[in-house]
């Protein structure tokens, strides 16, 4: 899956419908709480899901600032979940 962001395009691993449904439950709960610590943990989980492992995620996202990385990862989460309105988790 290709995800377009204002920082470029990112090729992300595909997931199954079952995996997407399981993650959707988690994403909904975290979005509802607006807990930034949980949101950052979720973003880290999706970075590994999208890119395969921590090293690949670091290679791909390592040149971004923390806020830019948050924006990219939130866009990736929303793309996986089919959510159109992003939630701002930066800064």
Q: PLM features: residue spans?
A:
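Short acidic-hydrophobic surface loop/beta-edge motif
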Residues: 1-8
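Short, surface-exposed, charged amphipathic helix/loop patches that serve as local interaction elements
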Residues: 14-91
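Short hydrophobic-aromatic micro-motifs
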Residues: 10-12
């Amino acid at each position: 899956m290709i995800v377009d962001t204002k920082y470029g395009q990112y090729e992300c691993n595909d997931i199954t419908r079952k995996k997407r449904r399981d993650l959707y439950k988690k994403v909904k709960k975290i979005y509802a709480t607006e807990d930034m610590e949980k949101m950052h943990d979720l973003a880290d989980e999706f970075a590994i899901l999208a890119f395969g492992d921590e090293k690949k995620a670091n290679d791909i996202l390592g040149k971004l600032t923390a806020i830019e990385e948050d924006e990219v990862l939130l866009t990736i989460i929303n793309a996986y979940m089919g959510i159109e309105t992003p939630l701002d988790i930066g800064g």
